[in-house]
């Protein structure tokens, strides 16, 4: 035990001497304990800091060094300092200051000032406080005695020290009744810990719901969130990445890469945020006061108040019902006579009066006590039932609201009540042993809960045919339809017909359309009797013919005439219901329907609703080269191989690459995955994990990318002209399936390897294309020599691919540094001195009013370009206050121009573009060069932006105008657009603002020639999604072997020149000198 005391400060030498004496004393005669008075008293002879150890103990405790006080020699102008031990002394009352004479007398008498103070303060204590201090001291002594006994202190010594010493009394008096040293110290530690907890809780991030009232919508940008989808019962994580001012929707990007615009008030969203961030962003915790799971709370209260008339519960009243172990749920009271024949529900429960209810949303029946039912209005006002977070609660609230508005139950609820009161319920349950013993029935003290049977949940009833499930349209196989009818997969229906056991009785038959498990492409028709016997066939008639034959044998054996007459002669299609006009209308409606829930196709393709093979993980690629073919990855367009663009997914393909032999004649074209008869769930490629793209079916019923089928050696196309189906998937080497892609890291699919002989790097073909690796043809020029009409077997081109390390770079691109040097030299150009002397005395030259001539013009433009930023020209009214360019551009409110849904042809799309381009585009100062064009509204990838118009001239005329006229017009520029070798558009003096679009090596637009009503037009298309107020650019591809134009786009992948270097390189390889030509001779 370490004892501490207040000692006067000594000199450094004395301090050293005290330490030595302590150690010497402990070594010669170890002391087991010491009197507390000797420890705490300053006047004690052993005025030292002692360290006591038990005999035989090896544990050593180092003594703490306390600050030593000065000598107690009295000084005329300074009093001795009092050292406080363990506790902080409160401020004492002011007392009379002793004179110098009194202090001298006290010193002569041998009484120290500290002792006198202690005695005076001890005398001032009253009796009550003294008793209180004694009780606290006894408590402290009990605690301290245990610690001393552990250190080996004798119990007799403890009794001696029971009387509180003077120093202890002084501490008590000075502290004015505070807690003991240890307790005060623990209290301070507790306060510190509480402060740490409060600080940690304030900075710790938690998932909470926030309020949107009085908060800037832009404050939510950057916050992590998770969105609850009720129909999936899943929280999807994501983050807020933007805010649309026009629609007032926030842009949410999910963890799987998908994004959508949401109104946060209408969704169930939680944010990951701390208290400090909430205070910084001026946010508050959200509640369900305004909107309750999509339902207007005020409207529900008004409807419930107008609906509720009496206090007692009666049939058809809407209530809140509570089942044990379940949340309160909206329900309707059902008449007792409705389900009097249902087993279990007609039993009276103990505990008083009971009511029969049916729940909204789940449509389950239950019998509960009256005390378990709450008025619907009372429940809404208390808000306690509205805290339910189950996915079906929102659906139940919608049905309850509809019932309050129209006083009409959903069709399924009404039908179940009718079925329960008829023999239909007994027929439905005839295949079961006993409905009361089924797992769907629930009975507990005071309540009975019965779920409706599965076969009773029929969607449509047409005569004696009950359709339970319509199924889904199959588009990956042509065998699920014939010339007259379509057979949806999963179609389920029931019908009453002659029983196989008793010809005089009737039974229920269940009919289904399934997929063959072996072939996976053909349907299987199955009919199941109430006894469980099944009849299968490849057509509906094949199934029912087996049943007809069985019935005929039974009738012949029993000498019973045909009961139903012509009933046995109806076809299987009639028995399934496919020939019924109403059923056919329902099936045709499936072709145009989409999933009605919030679960979109991207969530299906993301892997949450598909049974993916082991190792599969979808890979989504944001293609930057939208102007290139998705199959061959080339951007050239030819007269016999035009481009096609899907109007829905904006994918670009060549007609030959996709196998589109029939011309589309100006009609908007859709790919196989975007057509109305396409799959509800986009199929995945069986050769790679990349989602989307140009896909075709395989011979084994799956789908694959055309690019994957071309690059993988084992696969091929059975019909090269139609580019389908893909064959040879099963012939792919097993070792190729085991390769791991070095780019995406997904083990799913078949990979190719680097063409270098010593390299074994593997990757998927589309992953390599997205990563920018060299995936090209060995002899690309030979591709144009191939003929599609000739079916020659030797028409093939070798395909090469190289990894990042071995990719072949062209030496022609190394001249980029040399190309930009002349522009640097021009920027450093210094104008020559004026030959006429001082320029201020020179008359104004009207011939030079358009600016300085070359090279002064280029030098000035190069230096000025360093300080120019994009500044669109915005037409606005007079304003007294000045606004920054950012506020004028990004703070303006422009209405979004939506594309009409009735556009069905390219001509209508072209007309809409011509009518709206003035509202969508604006010109202004460009940071690249001169003036430019800016988008006032966002544009989607593939949208028509503007038409390039001007004067149509021949190439020789264009060359003469450019060299003789336009080159001398400094500041005017030249705007020549070459269509082909015979036509050039001159937009210098005539045309639209499209000629102001600048060049960029990484453009966001591209140009295409389209045909509208027999006329050709040059259209600028959006290559990717163009943001608001973004400058429009496209690649000029200036073709000239001798002349080089410097590029100032400033993008990281800038090639330094405006010239099309690849085309010039190909052109240089084609041309050869005359001396290199050889005379051609026939062999």
UniProtKB/Swiss-Prot annotation:
InterPro entries: ATX1/2_ePHD, ATX1/2_PHD, EPHD, FYrich_C, FYrich_N, Histone_Mod_Regulator, Post-SET_dom, PWWP_dom. Activated via O-glycosylation. A zinc finger (PHD-type) spans 626-677, 739-807. It catalyses: N(6)-methyl-L-lysyl-[histone] + S-adenosyl-L-methionine = N(6),N(6)-dimethyl-L-lysyl-[histone] + S-adenosyl-L-homocysteine + H(+). S-adenosyl-L-methionine binds at residues 929, 975, 998-999, 1036. Residues 422-443 are annotated as: Disordered. Pfam families: FYRC, FYRN, PWWP, SET, zf-HC5HC2H_2. Residues 520-604 form the FYR C-terminal domain. A zinc finger (C2HC pre-PHD-type) spans 682-715. Its main location: nucleus. Residues 315-379 form the PWWP domain. Disulfide bonds: none annotated. GO terms for cellular component: Set1C/COMPASS complex. Residues 919-1037 form the SET domain. It is found in: Nucleus. Expressed in roots, leaves and flowers and, to a lower extent, in young seedlings. Glycans are attached at residue 968. Zn(2+) binds at residues 1001, 1047, 1049, 1054. GO terms for molecular function: histone H3K4 dimethyltransferase activity; histone H3K4 methyltransferase activity; zinc ion binding. SMART domains: FYRC, FYRN, PHD, PWWP, SET. It is an enzyme of class 2 (transferase). PANTHER family: HISTONE-LYSINE N-METHYLTRANSFERASE ATX2, PHD FINGER PROTEINS. Belongs to the class V-like SAM-binding methyltransferase superfamily. Histone-lysine methyltransferase family. TRX/MLL subfamily. Histone methyltransferase. Dimethylates 'Lys-4' of histone H3 (H3K4me2). H3 'Lys-4' methylation represents a specific tag for epigenetic transcriptional activation. Methylates only a limited fraction of nucleosomes of target genes (e.g. NAP and XTH33). Involved in epigenetic regulation of the floral repressor FLC and FT to prevent the transition from vegetative to reproductive development. This is Histone-lysine N-methyltransferase ATX2. The gene is ATX2.
